[in-house]
């Protein structure tokens, strides 16, 4: 039963959707005995049976009940896990193209198998999207037993695969991959010179795990494949020295708006310093036409110092500035801030300054995932962003009931006057938990705070584990053991971690580590059973101690991130506890706290080392968070409107590329005709064409090296007759050229050259166009001062520029083809190879590929073969 039918008849309330799906669950349960009676071969044979029924006219909805029953039985046999009724409901939500909100520990990985299997029957591919390579690999290996038992192929894609391996993986029925890999493969495919080199096969159905993290938190970050632009990097070092000499009165910081402004005193001081470095003329001001570029460098340097903090927004690793994801605390290696900000940070940290990049291709997750014919998602926290999911992605959120009621207790926040007092209170609270062997998970918002708290625990001899961007490699194991009695785990933003915290520890993860060195099979089995028993006893101890205790050391801007941290505790009916410790020095309190809240706290009077508990404070904080979320949503919505303009143009360009790669070049005559008419129109802007015959002859000789006969042109009575004559001459010229090339080399050499020339010219102009559009987008807001709508102005100008670019592409392609000279095979091959690779920066074959794939250049774009 589809969601749209439900909404039409009953309305789209969560309760009614769940009620309707429970009826379908009863039908699935009724088939359980029948499925259990089937042999393994008969169960596997159901897949081909379903595919045949689809060919005979049935729909996926018709097959949902038996298909889900088959998956549940296969899971019971081969994974020793039986889908709960609520998991079946979650699978139906996914199949109907909605978001399934399921609490932590409710088995989202298993839920995905239901919708993935059902939709794979169409043979068009299913993408299951995870937040990191570890989860993609883990889930594939874990669920492959189920899929393979039913004759369904499954594969995963990580950043170290070659193009050949990627293409093979994408051909599987079900593919697990990260959002980054999928989107970058899409961009890389649309930079290829042959359809055979492309790895993806379309966007049929996608299931996005941690959907809020990917489609909301990362929505503003475009994925960019870029190449370096040559420029003088010394200027960043000079500007860095200038900014370090400024005092507080020289600038104003707006932390809410994430901007820094120079004051009048600051402008004067900067101008004086710029002159001392000979960066602007002696009598020039900062805002003179010739000097205004310096404001860009100054602005970025000020942002680097006043808005970006080491170990919070970025870390320095191996001599490079590595961005930290503000929502997940993960390092985003390979990504760089644009517009000179990354160079400003490198200058600030006294590192080697890398060249600023030029965008070769880009796409946002918003626009990438909207290409799927059907999209669905899973997360533990989506309800707070339900409006955005509905408006942007047309995805409705359905809250799935838990299999067992949640027993976790959420205690009111405690607020302290200073950060030091807050951390002392956290220390005392952790010590109390430690004494009763209650496992503790502490969430921090930055690496700096996690290491500060770690040092405090060390000074009190409290053994603990730290999980932040610095220790990403050990992430899964650390989190898996966070439920061991007496364990203390510190983690930056728990969003998207993806690994379940089980009370007593994760027996499988422990076994993987402890059994590594044991070769004897009997000894391994004995040791494994010991681990299982140990974990079982530890679970009982942890439960008696109160279950997992989650401690938040600061409220995040987003309620979802706080809820995700809380949600680590109380899985599958386990007991648990959560509590947040705050201070007036926290960012959220300092920047977004209301005047009313500050007034209230002042009246109450905070004494040293004393905390305030009050339900009103929790409500006030939630109100502040809602304001921030609403503002961030407005920003994302506005950015999407602008990006939609670029995205529509991107679709046209990529479609044009694929058309060129996929077809023989039979329509060149039409291109010639359009270009020729454009040339003649450009010459004859008014009056009779015969007055311009001299200019027409001269122009076509310059463009094509073709001599048109003046006397022949003079015979024609109007422009159209002349155009027909010119078109015939141009066609004759290129036909002769094609015959000659093919006779001297391979029979399809000319066709290959035409395709390459059209694509290389298009790619070059598209890159330039993207750069111009970005500049236009950054400056367009000023139009509002002239009572004009910036978005409408952007649409209008972007369209005109796009039309102009396409005309230029046609003209430039014909011009280059006309002047293309015949050379020996080797020279032609080298020329095509050189032109093809001019789009990417020069790198050695063992360096990382500049397309951000993470692979060596020789295994990525350096491995692409050229026509010889």
Curated annotation (Swiss-Prot):
- Give the GO molecular function terms: ATP binding; metal ion binding; protein-exporting ATPase activity
EC supergroup of this enzyme: translocase
Q: What is its EC number?
A: 7.4.2.8
- Annotated residues that bind ATP are located at 87, 105-109, 500
Does this UniProt record's set of keywords contain rRNA processing?
Answer: no
Q: Where in the cell is it found?
A: Cell membrane; Cytoplasm
InterPro entries listed in its UniProt record: Helicase_ATP-bd, P-loop_NTPase, SEC_C_motif, SecA, SecA_CS, SecA_DEAD, SecA_motor_DEAD, SecA_preprotein_X-link_dom
Provide a GO biological process annotation: protein targeting
Function field: Part of the Sec protein translocase complex. Interacts with the SecYEG preprotein conducting channel. Has a central role in coupling the hydrolysis of ATP to the transfer of proteins into and across the cell membrane, serving both as a receptor for the preprotein-SecB complex and as an ATP-driven molecular motor driving the stepwise translocation of polypeptide chains across the membrane.
Q: Which PANTHER family match?
A: CHLOROPLAST PROTEIN-TRANSPORTING ATPASE, SECA INNER MEMBRANE COMPONENT OF SEC PROTEIN SECRETION SYSTEM
What protein is this chain from? Protein translocase subunit SecA
Q: Which organism is it from?
A: Wolbachia pipientis wMel
